[in-house]
Amino acid sequence: ILIGPVFSKKLSEIYQVVDHIKIPVLSFSNNKKLKNNNVWLLGKMQEDEIEYIIDFGIKTGINKLAIIGENTEYSKTLIFTAKKTLLNKGIDLDVIIFEKETLNDRSKLRHKVKKISGWKKEFKNKLILPKPRYDGILFTGSNEFILKLAPLLSYYDLNSDRVTYLGNSNFKSSQLVNELSLQGTFFSSSNDPKIDEFKNEWRENWGLSPSYFSILAYDLALFAKKLSLEKDFSNYITRTQGHKWLSGEV
């Protein structure tokens, strides 16, 4: 058995040299494209979170959504899921990609944000602003990307008071929670397991709270110990009743 941390990049490398994986691989990846025989993906499925938050956004009355992302595999995966979900529900949408060149040039970045918002200099003196082009914005990029973009969106009249901001569980990070321009963002997340005793013990030993991957690593180590006592690995891993772990049921 091969146990994580085996993330998406490593899985891709394994697939390039091995056609048929014969031993069980318990991976930390959450990339559904990498599903395979004998490979189990145990990371949080970000695509599911995107579908949940879109459903919520539609219920709040969003009719036109801007999907904003960057030119990365992570962002493209979420954009693909969001676009498919919105088209199936008949919601008007625009996909807006920020290239690395634009993100690294403050002048180009400002210009693109102004173009998206329809901002004009004369709006600064108006008490009542024109209706925004979008009633919702879905962020699909990294934390760094979102932190670079959000203050500019806010400055150019696409702030969270005028437009509904949506995101996934990335928004639980302290970086995004503490960013003033992102206050009022709605985001989806899987339920955190109720494991106070484990967390308290972890803090006593290590002086900090365990991350999701720390909890998952603990689960996998314990699982491997149990698995070593089984004759048929595959049958045990895929048993009907599943497995109850600290990080959730699998």
Regions found by a protein language model. Name each.
Residues 1-250:
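Extracytosolic ligand-binding ectodomains
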